[in-house]
Amino acid sequence: MGYGQEKESTTAGLAKMNAVLHRKAEIIIKSGNTFSNPQYMDKSDNSVLERFDYIVANPPFSMKNWRDGLVGKEYGRFEGYGDMPPEKNGDYAWLMHILKTLQSNGKAAVILPHGVLFRGNAEATIRETIIKKHWIKGIISLPANLFYGTGIAACILVIDKEGAANRQGIFMIDASRGYVKDGNKNRLRERDIYRIITTFNEQITTDPKYARFIPNDEIEKKNGYNLNITRYIDSTDPEDIQDIYAHIHGGIPAVDIDGLSKYWEVFPSLKSELLSTISEKYYSLNVEHESIRQTIYKNTEFSEYGEKLDEAFAAWKAKEYPVLSTLDEDVSARELIVSLVEDIIAEFEHLTLIDKYDAYQVLLAYWNEVMNDDVSLIISESDGYTNARATDNIEEEITQGKNKGEMKVTGWEGRLIPKSIVIDAFFREEKNAIEEAENIVAETESQLVDLIESADEESALADVAENGKVKAKDIEAQIVELTSTIETEETIELEVIRTDLKLVNTKRRLEAYLVGHPLCKSTVNENGKITKSSIDYRLHIIRTEECVPESLQDDVNQLKAALDLCSKVSDYNKVVKDLNKALDEKCRARYEVLTDDEILDLLVNKKWFDSIFSGINDLYTAISHCLTSRIIELAERYENTLPELDKETIEYEAKVKSHLERMGFKWE
């Protein structure tokens, strides 16, 4: 059973919801001011606060009115510390309340502003008393701007009264740099949380820039009970020092190259491929800047490292496949992910250049985004893996028109297996045909853009182009407008007959008319008749192809070329649409007949494992990116020596003086 107290009803509701989400539904949240009206009193003595085994709290930071209504209701919470918390700051008041309501062997975790670690006056006195009691087991410094409503940096005080008498110090973690930007706030990643937990639980001190066990003497005698994390852990990066000699004479300082030792230890031959020794303290670059990444990828040891990464992932896959291919209702999703995480960390722990916590982040990010839902669906329903044969329509709400508010089907997707995976597995030929047609569309559109961009501003094509685009109907209208006034003997006769088709509406009339007007023979269609459409077609041919005057030739040709490209785009877009529709139907039908083996292969191997490996492979790619970026940075920093820059400056100065003199000015 869990217990809590909250003054604000809204926040109390959130606390209850949070408990349910964490599968702790049995919780009681009472209302009231924790300081002036504590709700949990000892059952045998109503004048004594009830004590608890575990307390977790994230109280309001720096509360200014915490003493309101407190007189006579202190319940001994603030006695024995040498002073009272400041009237305008309730941070230590919360901590003292928690310490009072904690059992003699109880444990607590409290989130408080960083200031509680080092502020002076009354708070310093209280802090010293708490430190001397050895109740603080650990301090975890968190990133700033982590919580909504405040950008203040916070920390977690881990309290453990059990074993306090024999406690030799405080375990400190500086996790202030482990986060990712999320909008205008910072957010702890899964890897950051996991690193904090494992480092604290296992008391890991292999990275002194992240965590240390601080002896009592260092806290009490050396730092006067000041717990500011920066006094004990220096998490800052080493200063990137500029080398004056290298700026003057050139060369990359050996001290900077040695700073990349973690890479050279794994890829020893790569160092000699990229760099040559100038002297004991300086190197030169052997390859051009743009060839560095290619040189790294071609390096045998770099490739071998990639193979080791593949082997580590393959070993993890081999271990997890039997588990992930036999999920049922007896499996706990929570226990499953813990096992998956522990195993992937074990496999990647020996790969020195890839942080095991990065591998953890890849897995946890995919679990939270996709895999958790998949596993939950499989283990929570009797259908299990056969859910993979199901497909679901994608619906969107109609936002306007007479059907506004109704839902319409806009597509479909596999319930467990994305259709992209099914297409890749069974319909590669059809997919290639679609991609080929799409490539033609893209290439044709590119040609059309080039044609528009190359057109003269005064051209007819430029007149119909808008924001670099044209429409076929606008091009056709422009062609008609340009050529409609073109006249020949034939067009004159055709225009006459077009206005009075009765002249040729019978076979006898047609034959008689053609004897006197032989130029009109070109409009007789395949049925032996002259119609309005056959006349219009002939007029179009005459005016746009046969009799275009030289003054209009360039414009008409350009418009016709653009129209041809537009038509090609339209035709192939239709091809793409038809092919997609046919593939969509075949793909959906294929879901229904997936075999059990196909389901496991598509779901476990192609969806889960391939997605996770994609993230792992990004870590491998990042190695070359980081190494390349650093070497280029160093090479460019010392590429131009001071004498060279000085010489270049003198040359430019001479050129400027020469130009000024030619303009009639003198520069002394």
Stretches with model-predicted labels:
Residues Q5-L49:
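S-adenosyl-L-methionine
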Residues L49-R415, K419, E429, I434, ...:
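A conserved structural/catalytic subdomain of Rossmann-like adenosyl-cofactor enzymes
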Residues M1:
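Conserved SAM-binding loop of SAM-dependent methyltransferases across substrates and taxa
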